[in-house]
Structure formats: structure tokens, C-alpha cells
Regions:
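N-terminal nucleotide-binding beta1-loop-alpha1 segment
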Residues: 1-19, 33, 193
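Alpha-helical elements of Rossmann-like donor-binding domains used by nucleotide-donor carbohydrate transfer enzymes
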Residues: 36, 40, 59, 90, ...
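Active-site metal-binding loops of divalent metal-dependent hydrolases
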Residues: 10, 105-107
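Conserved N-terminal catalytic core of the sugar/cofactor nucleotidyltransferase
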Residues: 2-5, 31-104, 170, 174-176, ...
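Short catalytic helix/loop segments, enriched in acidic residues and glycine
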Residues: 20-35
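Short beta-strand-to-loop element that shapes/binds the nucleotide-sugar donor at the catalytic cleft/hinge
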Residues: 55, 124-141
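Catalytic-core segments of class I nucleotidyltransferases/pyrophosphorylases
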Residues: 101, 108, 114-118, 130-131, ...
Length: 223
């Protein structure tokens, strides 16, 4: 199975750090966020990795080629960030037609993916307990089926999931820039084709300066 790392965003909420450094290259401890997640994938048996890049993408590419010189890591280039959905659509020519693992580059975590299914009809999401910055949650589970409540949901999407490329191949999108959560998954959630599981392991979405500081604090306490 291949894996894709989403790494093309601007990281605006992490300014001024991301003025000259793309968010995936920000460090927790001595490692960049993306370095940690590549090591996570390699540790879990993934050897074919695709990374989409755009904003300051050349810095990400140079960093990865330097840190992982012998790895089979390919890059999907975007002239401007295409969003989570558009980024995947643009990378399908590299990813192929088989189910792949999708992971955000900007999460600090210790999530166990050993018990993930081998394939999915549409998508399989890993959820975590709602953090303070997302108390409304993203989705809920009943017998491993994903559904969305009108008000508060039980889980937050961790940024790790399995994706079946068919959900992109069988749809026509008005723009090449779009969000997978808003423009792709709802249709399949309503059809009962999106499954999920809950993780109780450590997880931080490093999307703001405060949460970057928190990730470093947690890292220092663990090491």
C-alpha cells in the first residue's frame, strides 16, 4: 500500500514562523514534523510515499532528499495549494487506483495503525477525542460506520485515513482546488460507505503557535 502526506498548505496560522519555513519543516524536538511522519510511515512498513508540495515546496523537497536519500519518496507538485481534495486528485497519477493511506504532515502523534483494514469502499477515518480547539467534533461512529450529527460530534478527524481513489475517479469537480471533507466525503458518508475507528493515543494538530509549543512540551516530557 502506498501512502500520501499532505504538505502543500500555507500554514498561515503559524506566521511569522512560516514566512520563510513551510509548516511541515517546523520542528518538534530535533525533527521536522514531516520527518517524524515519514519515519512513522517507514516504521509501519510503508516504502512508497507520495508528498504533495506547493508553498515553499522546494525547501520541503530538499529537506526530504537530504534526510531520506535512499527512500522511494515521490513529489506531486502544485503551482498553488489545491486543498486536501485537489491535492489528492492531482496526485492520483502517482498513487494509482489502489487504496492508500493519507496522513497530514502537521500532526504530532503516536497513533497505532497496525489494525487498519487493508482496503475500504470509500474511506476509513481514524478519529480522536475532541480537543479544546474543536469541541464540536467532526464525526461520530456507530458500529464502525461514520455519521455526522447536527450539533456536537464525538470525534475529531486525526488527519490519518485510508482513501479509495474511486471516490475521486467517479466524480466531476467544478474546480481543481477543493476540500475532501466538504466536497467529497459527505456523499459517501450518507451512503454508509465511510467507516472509522477511534484512537486513544497521543495526538496534537500542530496548526497554531500555541499547539506547536504544546507539542514540544509533550515531546520534552516523553523524552
Amino acid at each position: 500500500m502506498k501512502a500520501m502526506i499532505l504538505a502543500a498548505g500555507f500554514g498561515k496560522r503559524l506566521m511569522p514562523l512560516t514566512q520563510d519555513t513551510p509548516k511541515p519543516l517546523l520542528k518538534v524536538g530535533n525533527e521536522s514534523l514531516i520527518q517524524r511522519n515519514i519515519n512513522f510511515l517507514i516504521k509501519n512498513g510503508f516504502s512508497d510515499i507520495v508528498i504533495n508540495i506547493s508553498y515553499l515546496g522546494e525547501l520541503i523537497e530538499d529537506h526530504i532528499k537530504n534526510v531520506f536519500p535512499n527512500s522511494n519518496i515521490l513529489f506531486s507538485y502544485e503551482d498553488h495549494p489545491l486543498g486536501t481534495g485537489g491535492g489528492i486528485l492531482n496526485a492520483l497519477k502517482i498513487l494509482g487506483s489502489e487504496t492508500f493511506l493519507l496522513i497530514n504532515s502537521d500532526i504530532y502523534h503516536d497513533i497505532d495503525i497496525q489494525n487498519l483494514p487493508n482496503t475500504t469502499d470509500a474511506a476509513h477515518l481514524i478519529g480522536v477525542k475532541n480537543p479544546s480547539h474543536n469541541e464540536q467534533g467532526d464525526f461520530s461512529l456507530t458500529k464502525n460506520k461514520v455519521f455526522i450529527k447536527e450539533n456536537t460530534n464525538d470525534l475529531t478527524w486525526s488527519g490519518i485515513s485510508l482513501i479509495n481513489p474511486i471516490i475521486f475517479e467517479e466524480n466531476i469537480f467544478e474546480s481543481n482546488s477543493f476540500n475532501i471533507w466538504k466536497s467529497v466525503l459527505p456523499k459517501y458518508i450518507k451512503k454508509g460507505m465511510v467507516t472509522g475507528q477511534e484512537s486513544h493515543e497521543s495526538w496534537i494538530d500542530v496548526g497554531t503557535l500555541d499547539r506547536l509549543k504544546l507539542a514540544n512540551t509533550v515531546h520534552n516530557e516523553e523524552n
